[in-house]
């Protein structure tokens, strides 16, 4: 099956059979979710668009959880493995997207890490927590069929980033999830749906 480079063309095709055929054609097993790191840290970033920030940070190796919310603007909270990434690498990814405003520190460790990695960026101390809202917007709105699959946090992060940036769908679904997705697609196709 030839890969489609034009995302708008992909979205116009009746996905009921196309996506299922692509999943069924794969013979490799899904990549197992990595074991949760023994120790994680949390970082909070203020930005212009939390949906973009969440999708961007979801592509950074070592990010294990993302949440979006509001605290005098839009924020993304990231739980990450400090053995794989740091605040500087995550901020660099956000700066490449053009959406990073400030690093928010709510404890002495976060403040020290911000000063260590982000000398040229604004670091704001906060006294209250953000009001968090439902995450993974791109996955939920562009691919509700995938969002309905009891995804692990790691699967949801990977698929949400893919939903935003496009490209080949990451092979993160288990065989059971692929089977369930196929049944969802068949039901939708029978009803005349294109999702």
Predicted regions: what they are:
Residues 1-5:
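N-terminal secretory signal peptides that target proteins for export/translocation
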Residues 22-195:
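Flexible coil/turn and secondary-structure edge motifs
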Residues 11-22:
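Bacterial N-terminal signal peptides
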Residues 8-10, 57:
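N-terminal leader/presequence-like segments
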